[in-house]
């Protein structure tokens, strides 16, 4: 495939596949070949047979037929230099049959013969809540605003939704169905609830949800596993990490953009995992009619562990945004006064 000024291909000769990129291709001389998957040597499985890319979005997605997981490579070029690149993976509800990218949308066909799409750029029709001239995107799958007719019962304190004709068309849902109040004039904009299915086309929600603009869809999990932290220094155009030093992490600081509800998990050697759930807004800091989201926020997470003894994971299974922009850490560093030769 062509990435613009370079060409990329899959090398399937080993136990795991490799994603190579060729540059400086000319009639005379050999091109420069770089193994872009060297930083994730076990990420790409063998026998990859589905490959698609979007040069406009600097994105390559690859996968295997009858597999429910695809791997992605995102890159950023400025001029003739590669400034940044990253690997990620997506897991679908059903195995994949075919996929392609067109008009800034990633389309994939699963084993249910259901053609679905993921938008690579923001569209005007994407579900969101606008507050104080700031737009907060809602992160749900298979979303819609057509929930049929609803009625509230004061005796049962339940709102019943009927005539939800699309509900039985969603096959093999792996996550929870949620309903979100997206009416900015509502007294409780941003609230969400998990309904109870009463039939194939109806469900109930606790509380009064009648007469407001609602968005309904399925939750999905967002997870970021951070690598081991080392003190690094820039030497020329490269950064060198001091892996022989002693570093005790005291705390990390998560620099968020638009943020709602999220959680962190510390996986420590010899200790039980520690999970903490955070809400971005603080008490007595916002009105009851405001959505509980912030435009930007810096959260300090205490660690107090040696850098090689802890793995840190950021997760969010909430419809609110969780935009991580940067991360910094503080700790006790010692070079151990080794003499290097």
What is each residue range found by the language model?
Residues 1-341:
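Beta-sheet repeat architectures centered on beta-propellers
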């Amino acid at each position: 495939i062509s990435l613009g000024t370079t060409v990329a291909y899959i090398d399937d000769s080993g136990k795991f596949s490799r994603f190579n990129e060729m540059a400086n291709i000319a009639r005379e001389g050999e091109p420069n070949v770089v193994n872009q998957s060297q930083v994730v040597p076990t990420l790409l499985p063998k026998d990859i047979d589905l490959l698609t890319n979007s040069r406009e979005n600097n994105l390559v997605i690859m996968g295997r037929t009858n597999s429910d997981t695809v791997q992605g490579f995102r890159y950023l070029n400025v001029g003739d230099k590669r400034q940044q690149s990253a690997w990620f993976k997506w897991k679908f509800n059903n195995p994949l049959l075919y996929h392609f990218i067109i008009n800034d949308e990633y389309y994939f066909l699963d084993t249910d013969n259901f053609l679905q799409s993921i938008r690579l750029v923001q569209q005007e029709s994407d579900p969101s809540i606008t507050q104080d001239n700031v737009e907060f995107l809602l992160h749900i799958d298979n979303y819609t605003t057509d929930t049929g007719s609803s009625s509230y019962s004061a005796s049962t304190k339940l709102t019943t939704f009927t005539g939800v004709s699309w509900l039985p068309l969603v096959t093999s849902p792996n996550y929870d169905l949620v309903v979100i109040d997206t009416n900015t004039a509502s007294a409780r904009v941003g609230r969400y609830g998990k309904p109870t299915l009463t039939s194939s086309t109806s469900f109930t929600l606790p509380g009064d949800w009648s007469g407001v603009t609602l968005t309904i869809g399925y939750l999905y999990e967002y997870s970021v596993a951070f690598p081991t932290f080392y003190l690094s220094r820039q030497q020329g155009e490269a950064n060198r990490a001091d892996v022989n030093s002693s570093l005790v992490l005291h705390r990390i600081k998560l620099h968020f953009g638009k943020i709602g509800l999220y959680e962190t998990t510390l996986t420590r050697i010899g200790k039980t995992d520690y999970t903490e759930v955070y809400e971005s807004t603080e008490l007595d800091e916002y009105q009851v009619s405001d959505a509980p989201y912030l435009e930007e926020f810096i959260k300090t997470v205490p660690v107090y562990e040696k850098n090689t003894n802890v793995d840190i994971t950021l997760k969010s299974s909430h419809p609110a945004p969780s935009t991580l922009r940067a991360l910094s850490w503080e700790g006790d560093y010692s070079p151990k006064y080794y003499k290097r030769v």
